[in-house]
Amino acid sequence: MSFNRRSKNITEGVARAPNRSMYYALGYQQDDFSKPMIGVANGHSTITPCNSGLQKLADAAVIGIKEAGGNPQIFGTPTISDGMAMGTEGMKYSLVSREVIADCVETCVGGQWMDGVIVIGGCDKNMPGGMMGMLRANVPALYVYGGTILPGKYKGQDLNIVSVFEAVGQFSAGKMAEEDFCEIERRAIPGSGSCGGMYTANTMSSSFEALGMSLPYSSTMANVEEEIVASVKVAAGVLVEAVKADLKPRDIVTKKAIENAVAVIMATGGSTNAVLHFLAIAHAAEVEWTIDDFERVRRRTPVLCDLKPSGKYLAIDLHHAGGIPAVMKELLKHGLLHGDCMTITGKTVAENLADVPDLRADQDVIRAVTNPIYAEGHLAILKGNLSPEGCVAKITGLKSPVMTGPARVFEDEQSALAAIMANKIVAGDVMVLRYLGPKGGPGMPEMLAPTGALIGQGLGESVGLITDGRFSGGTWGMVVGHVAPEAYAGGNIALVQEGDSITIDAHQLLLQLNVSDDELARRRAAWTAPAPRYTRGVLAKFAFNASSASAGAVLDKFGG
């Protein structure tokens, strides 16, 4: 039996002789045309250390596909370095790249009639972009994460990229010597791999393992370790078997599977970006999933892992403590996962976890459900007159996730950062960064530079920051993002004035502008939308087409 269900459309029959000629030029032989064509979406790039170690994984995938009886076909996907673009206009292209990557995967798989695809990525938007493309194409598919980075070292302390952002605030406040500042800058990132805490890249990779679209244990491996190369060869064989079984992404990515992924995001203390990305992933999978579903899962799922940014450990420590399977096994034992969900291995979640040992007593990275770090998840969905469609608050690491204070209003990140660095922001203030949403930014840039500076100055818990933009996975503190409707669309965040009283209350799930309805009506009557910041090119296209953050900021949600 042949398994070239799709590729035979361009390799079989007299009329396809010209097509086969192109394949012969690539070194194919006649008997290759009966084998499945397997795409390898290679995100290798020397733009960023997150992706600079991916070529060896693509090479391993090629070998594994050939050994399993498939024809590997490599094509490229782009990346943006969030860490390098952060705090600049370049950050506006980050979320755009998610859509570009999704389009690349869907286009190549569809245009070349591929029978299956492996997507290999590293930096933050590589994961959701690749998954969205896989789900749109809906051919047998598997995600390979490029691996986490190992920590840097300085004066006996582990370092990572967020260490540098927070050092900026400490140095500017006179709390750090210049020599220490420069050495942290030089030593924080020792080599290839994605940023090391439970930031966005590691959050998404871990969630894909829980979703069933990556192999067990693969999401927390280090890029520089040999085990990841061996894992990719195994993954290639698993994918070829999935092609034979015609096991497709939409057979795996169901509503219950997304609930599993979100439960693991909550248990590991993952990134706020996961909310936006899983809204987009569910849309690509044609699964009914709303921002309120995150809150439903949050309330029943404890935080079990002591991971940065608000905790102690890095992703590689989680790997050594048992990885995502250990977390999932603990959740499954207490009825917090759906064990009957299918995975890319051809086995259910419960079957994959059957031989995973219970939590080891010699580690404190992962806690038991009966002894959690927090009884409920950390990504709370707030609503109120400032965000009737919902917004996302990250409430781990805070003594009290409640405050009321005067608004300090900024319409770009740079002026907000300048105010922090000039010591113009004081405890009790609520910073409002607006016109930074999907349409207004455009591209919903991340606000790690301001939040990192606040933490470095010791203001992380005493200053609130709300925005219609996003936050890096490395952010923690009194922060609320994804405010929807956004300012550019006329959301009430556009009506906030300097000095207005704002309440952030994660206990009551409330984000409220303490201004009367009559006053808001007067302000709205005087408000007009600003002119678009871009009228040509990819940012203009994104701004014109992007849905609300509460719907994932996707570009193909037509008619609403």
UniProtKB/Swiss-Prot annotation:
The annotation note on the cofactor reads:
Binds 1 [2Fe-2S] cluster per subunit. This cluster acts as a Lewis acid cofactor.
Catalytic machinery residues: 472 (proton acceptor)
Q: In its UniProt record, which GO terms are filed under biological process? A: isoleucine biosynthetic process; L-valine biosynthetic process
**Keyword terms:** 2Fe-2S, Amino-acid biosynthesis, Branched-chain amino acid biosynthesis, Iron, Iron-sulfur, Lyase, Magnesium, Metal-binding
Record bears the keyword Cytoplasm? no
Top EC class, one word: lyase
Q: Which reaction does it catalyse?
A: (2R)-2,3-dihydroxy-3-methylbutanoate = 3-methyl-2-oxobutanoate + H2O; (2R,3R)-2,3-dihydroxy-3-methylpentanoate = (S)-3-methyl-2-oxopentanoate + H2O
- Which residues bind Mg(2+) per the record? 82, 124-125, 446
An example of a GO molecular function for this protein is: dihydroxy-acid dehydratase activity
Protein purpose: Functions in the biosynthesis of branched-chain amino acids. Catalyzes the dehydration of (2R,3R)-2,3-dihydroxy-3-methylpentanoate (2,3-dihydroxy-3-methylvalerate) into 2-oxo-3-methylpentanoate (2-oxo-3-methylvalerate) and of (2R)-2,3-dihydroxy-3-methylbutanoate (2,3-dihydroxyisovalerate) into 2-oxo-3-methylbutanoate (2-oxoisovalerate), the penultimate precursor to L-isoleucine and L-valine, respectively.
Can you name this protein? Dihydroxy-acid dehydratase
The organism of origin for this protein: Leptothrix cholodnii (strain ATCC 51168 / LMG 8142 / SP-6) (Leptothrix discophora (strain SP-6))
